[in-house]
Structures are given as C-alpha cells and as structure tokens.
A protein has these predicted regions:
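S-adenosyl-L-methionine
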Residues: 103-156
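Conserved class I S-adenosyl-L-methionine
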Residues: 76-86
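Flexible, glycine-/basic-rich loop-and-beta segments that form/coincide
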Residues: 231, 236-280
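A basic, amphipathic helix-loop patch mediating RNA/tRNA/ribosome contacts
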Residues: 1-45, 80
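Short, glycine-/aromatic-enriched active-site segment of Class I SAM-dependent methyltransferases
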Residues: 177-194
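Glycine-rich helix-loop-beta junction characteristic of Rossmann-like nucleotide cofactor-binding loops
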Residues: 11, 69-76, 138-139
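A short glycine-rich, Lys/Arg-flanked "PGG" loop and its adjoining helix->strand segment in the class I
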Residues: 155-172
C-alpha cells in the first residue's frame, strides 16, 4: 500500500500523516499523482512527496544531520557511501553538507528520490546487498560511510561496509533496537518498550565493533523516533587507536563504556517517554 510505503521509506511519520499527504495531492508514484492511500506501491516506480516542506527528501535526513553535528563529522569534499539509501534522506544530507560524491547503496530498486538519482554527484547502486560489498565496487573508494537499514542487524552490515573505506575512515550508523533485540524483547507492533533492552543492544553493538578493529567513540539519541515510535540511536565509529585515529585536537578517541550508554539511554527515555521509569 502507498500509505505503508510512505512510512517505511521515511516520507511520512505515521500512517495518518501518509494518508493526509495522499489526500492533499502531494504524493506521486512513477511521476503520476497517487489517488488512494490504499493503492499498491508498485515495485520499480519511484514514490515521492512534493511540497512537503522537508529540508531533505525524507524525514530520515534529520537523523544523520543530528549525527554530523553531534559528532563533528565534516563531509566536505569527501567520497561517501550510504548503505541502505532507500529514498535518500542520508544521501541528501551528505550532499548538502558538501560531499563530493555519494554511493547510494540499496538492495531495493526504484526507491531513490528522482532529484538525487539525477544528481551527478550520486552513484546509484541498486539491487546491491550490503553483505556483498567489497572495495572493488568503488572507484574512488569512500572514506566516510553512513547506514540506516531495517530488518537486518548491523552485525551483518558493518563488516563489509567498514572494509570498503580507506583514507580518513569514519562511519556513522543508525542503531534500530527493534531490529537488533531478541524477538522476545520486542513488544507488540515491533516496538521496544524497555530501556534495559536498549542498553543491552547498544552494549552488544559497541563490543561487536571492537572485534572488527574499530571502536565506537560517540553515541547520541536520534532526534526523531522510527515510524512506529521506536527510539533509535546514532553511533560514531572510527578505527581503533592502534590505527592512528585522532580527534581534532590530536587526541586518541575514547571508547564508550557502559556508563556512557546508560546516560544516553536515560536521556532518550526522558525525552520520548518522560513519565516512564528507566530501569537500573
């Protein structure tokens, strides 16, 4: 359905908002105006929202924009890879931040917004599974990577994605606990409603990153929730100190510890669920 596809691709924050956009005549499928929210979103046809007054092609752009600001990531002049590009919210942010080129990688087809698809700085890599990424697919190789993926764990995406980077390597990942937690830890509607699960998931991902020869040096809360109201997190990943990683002042980055994770999770719950008691 068109309304569900709008939410899934980050073009609307809820099904109600998606239906309203269709009724207002702002939704286009393959160049033609969508008539009903219940119509099928046919594969291969680009779904777009016009005049929606968003600064990016999808609301997901707000998430990466927050990460670039919070972690002090400079995309100017860099070659980047967006793993799980979908409509292109992250790709759009990178371009607006001055990226020289963005490889937009997605396993799907026809999802990327037409404006980005026709931008000379964007290399569209559709029908490309993140698990199969290798350095040989990129010329030139990217130094900055970002990812926003669904229905797959970062543990499957990060190993190949990190390996394609070269130069001043850095990676920003959106962590979606609903796709990382055990099935029994995810509540009705696919929503994680336990802060302890958030801490557990983030701790596991941070430790996993360490096994890859990288380290998570920054963690922040996504400024907006996922489509079903899930709290999401942003992770700043750099090569380990042994690889010579340094911040702007020449200092080696510090690893995140359990206390850091607990503080960020508590801040997230205070923002999105102020009446809830965070477990300790």
């Amino acid at each position: 359905r068109i309304d569900a596809a709008l939410v899934e691709r980050g073009l609307a924050g809820s099904l109600d908002e998606a239906r309203l956009l269709v009724m207002e005549g702002k939704v286009y499928l393959g160049g033609g105006k969508a008539e009903k929210a219940s119509d099928k979103a046919k594969p291969g046809l680009v779904l777009t929202v016009r005049d929606n007054k968003l600064p990016y092609v999808s609301r997901g752009g707000y998430k990466l924009a927050r990460a670039l600001e919070a972690f002090g990531v400079d995309a100017r002049g860099r070659v980047c890879v967006d793993v799980g590009a979908s409509t292109g919210g992250f790709t759009d942010v990178l371009l607006q931040a001055g990226a020289a080129r963005v490889y937009a990688v997605d396993v799907g087809f026809g999802l990327l917004d037409w404006r980005l698809r026709s931008d000379a700085r964007v290399t569209v890599m559709e029908k490309t599974n993140a698990r199969g990424l290798t350095g040989e697919l990129f010329d030139p190789r990217p130094s900055l990577g970002v990812t926003d993926v669904s229905f797959i764990s970062l543990e499957a995406v990060l190993p190949p994605a990190l390996c394609v980077l070269e130069g001043a390597r850095r990676f920003v990942a959106l962590v979606k606990p609903q796709f990382e937690a055990r099935r029994e830890d995810v509540g009705q509607g696919g929503v994680v409603r336990d802060s302890a699960v958030h801490e557990k998931v983030l701790g596991r991902i941070v430790r996993f990153v360490d096994t890859l020869g990288w380290q998570a040096q920054g963690l922040d809360v996504s400024p907006i929730t996922g489509a079903e109201g899930n709290i999401e997190f942003l992770l700043d990943i750099v090569p380990r100190e042994a690889d010579g990683a340094r911040d702007g002042l020449g200092r080696a980055p510090e690893r995140l510890c359990e206390a850091d994770i607990a503080r960020v999770v508590a801040r997230a719950w205070a923002r999105f669920h102020p009446d809830a008691e965070v477990e300790r």
